[in-house]
Amino acid sequence: MKLSPTPSELLDWYDRCRRDLPWRDPGVTPWQILVSEFMLQQTPVSRVLPIWCDWVERWPTPSATAAASAADVVRAWGKLGYPRRAKRLHECATVIARDHGGVVPDDVDILLTLPGVGSYTARAVACFAYHQPVPVVDTNVRRVVARVVHGRADAAAASTVRDHADVSALLPKDSSAHRFSAALMELGATVCTARAPRCGLCPLSGCRWRQAGYPPAQGPARRPQAYAGTDRQVRGRLLDVLRDNEFPVTRAELDVAWPTDNEQRERALNSLLADGLVIQMTDGRFALVGEAG
């Protein structure tokens, strides 16, 4: 499998055009890269930036994060969404501090044993923190490969084995593999985008999709996920109340957060309890997990 133009041209483009993201700076630690990967899951970079900067200043190491209360960690997560990630990140820090001497593992298989770390995150940490030549495949990378290599507007259904094989075949056989992986991701995020690709700016403008005349995607258009009125929104409103209070709150205080649908509010609260993000005190009040009552 061959890219056109050469990997060096993609890397030259990356050096000129990449975004200035702090987790790419020299001196950033593997832990701080791991934190960024947790936060960037399903969350735009613009929302992650201020939270990540505050986080790594407050808790620069796994041990510092593990020593914090789970409530403080969930509170610091703010409005990044999917707050179970905050709880899992705290659990991950605890395991690293306790079982790995406070050092983020560099082995993909060991990384996969950590709480909240899946296939993508394990490989991203091995690649970007430890410069290992492992395939790192996210939605953006799959789209770039689909267009450049396979001549399709959209990627086929995800297949870990096939996707990793596609990207592995593209990786340079030298020490630049980690930068090449970052460049593929950057290209998909900023140029080879899903809805309005800027092919005139692409260093891989000889891609097969372009050569084929930009054939449209097959199948139904993907609809963006709704948020307004969903249980996710209700969960967020309830968590806002709990984050804004240093002490447990009553059910009546939570009711105010979503007064229009009692059944939906109760369902959202029960899901927060089931996820371990919220606890109910013996007196019936509610608090963030780990809150000192």
Q: What are the roles of these predicted feature ranges?
A:
Residues 4, 8-9, 13-235, 246-248, ...:
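Catalytic cores of DNA base-excision repair glycosylases
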Residues 259-273:
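Short amphipathic alpha-helical interaction segments
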Residues 273-286:
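A short, conserved structural fragment
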Residues 251-254, 288:
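Charge-rich alpha-helical segments
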Residues 40, 242, 269-272:
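Generic leucine side-chain signal with a strong bias for well-ordered alpha-helical environments
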Residues 292-293:
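Short, amphipathic alpha-helical interaction segments positioned at domain boundaries
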